[in-house]
């Protein structure tokens, strides 16, 4: 089919765009703790996990491994650009060995032998993702230097315990391959559904979970 080469070129152009494209995954609540965290295979490789915060699934956990001390960890926390989420400000934390011990209470237990670095929402930058045709607000964007090698976690949650939607991105090096061409339409449809692209506005800000 003639459309296939054109599609391949369009996808390649999207991946190579300055805005970049993260390889997506979608959470249905299965990544809610350290024992069932989403596995980040390589912290340099660009991935994103989309997650809906509910009263039953209040956290998103990702597990990573730092190959050496001093390794940089690039992370982003975003919120879909949906009217009811305009003031939604979740929080991100990196939990890993060598980080400072916790100085406050968290809605989850810090694994033994690990410290924590909290990355609170301090910005609200509009972001258009051409790969999926979606729009978001980026509320956290940091490169954190990991003081020790070994396993660690990235945790996202809403400090006010309100339902909402968020995504967490890790890494900056795109690693799309030929096989990903076959997944593109499914990824795009799922991302647009998550961002409620084309959907009618629904309600106002949600109340905190009891």
Outline where the language-model segments fall.
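C-terminal edge strands of extracellular/lumenal beta-sandwich accessory domains
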Residues: 22-34, 62, 90-100, 134-210
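Extended low-complexity, serine/threonine- and proline-enriched intrinsically disordered segments
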Residues: 86-115
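Extended, solvent-exposed segments with strong compositional bias
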Residues: 51, 110-146
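N-terminal signal peptide c-region/cleavage motif recognized by signal peptidases
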Residues: 16-18
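A mature extracytoplasmic/lumenal domain signature
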Residues: 68, 77-81, 158-160, 172
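Bacterial N-terminal signal peptides
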Residues: 6-14
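Positively charged n-region of N-terminal signal peptides that target proteins for export
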Residues: 1-5
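Non-catalytic, beta-strand-enriched accessory regions in extracellular/secretory proteins
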Residues: 40-66, 72, 78-81, 91-92, ...
